[in-house]
Amino acid sequence: MAGGKGKAGKDSGKSKSKVVSRSARAGLQFPVGRIHRFLKQRTTSSGRVGATAAVYSAAILEYLTAEVLELAGNASKDLKVKRITPRHLHLAIRGDEELDTLIKATIAGGGVIPHIHRYLMNKKGAPVPGKPGAPGQGPQ
């Protein structure tokens, strides 16, 4: 029986099915197999990880990535540029309260978030310290 065929060289009726990745089965873009391998490497000595754990982890990572990229895209659109930079990622993460608590890492090239404390701001009508007419600046 050459070539895996049945009687008289005819096909047995079964067509070879294409290999479908676990990412495609789950409807994800992130690689489920690779994440499963990484999870097995990082666990205890037995290296046993459930099959659905990798799918779930890939789905979580994909969701978080999509969320950050959407916010960074909005930040770049607000600044009227077409390319997302580390600065846009930084603004997106620090601008979202939940992502800010989740991601505490320093982003290289992200800069800082502009913030001036309320106490340092001038009140309307109040003289600015150091200028003539400010309290404590008169002749003594």
Swiss-Prot record:
CDD domains: HFD_H2A. GO terms for molecular function: DNA binding; protein heterodimerization activity; structural constituent of chromatin. Keywords: Acetylation, Chromosome, DNA-binding, Isopeptide bond, Nucleosome core, Nucleus, Ubl conjugation. Variant histone H2A which replaces conventional H2A in a subset of nucleosomes. Nucleosomes wrap and compact DNA into chromatin, limiting DNA accessibility to the cellular machineries which require DNA as a template. Histones thereby play a central role in transcription regulation, DNA repair, DNA replication and chromosomal stability. DNA accessibility is regulated via a complex set of post-translational modifications of histones, also called histone code, and nucleosome remodeling. It is found in: Nucleus; Chromosome. Expressed in somatic gonadal cells. Residues 1-23 are annotated as: Disordered. Monoubiquitination of Lys-124 gives a specific tag for epigenetic transcriptional repression. Disruption phenotype: RNAi-mediated knockdown results in sterility. Pfam families: Histone, Histone_H2A_C. One of its GO terms (biological process) is negative regulation of cell fate specification. The lineage of its organism: Eukaryota, Metazoa, Ecdysozoa, Nematoda, Chromadorea. It comes from Caenorhabditis elegans. InterPro entries: Histone-fold, Histone_H2A, Histone_H2A/H2B/H3, Histone_H2A_C, Histone_H2A_CS. The nucleosome is a histone octamer containing two molecules each of H2A, H2B, H3 and H4 assembled in one H3-H4 heterotetramer and two H2A-H2B heterodimers. The octamer wraps approximately 147 bp of DNA. H2A or its variant H2AV forms a heterodimer with H2B. GO terms for cellular component: chromatin; condensed chromosome; nucleosome; nucleus. There is a cross-link at residue 124 (Glycyl lysine isopeptide (Lys-Gly) (interchain with G-Cter in ubiquitin)). This is Histone H2A.V.
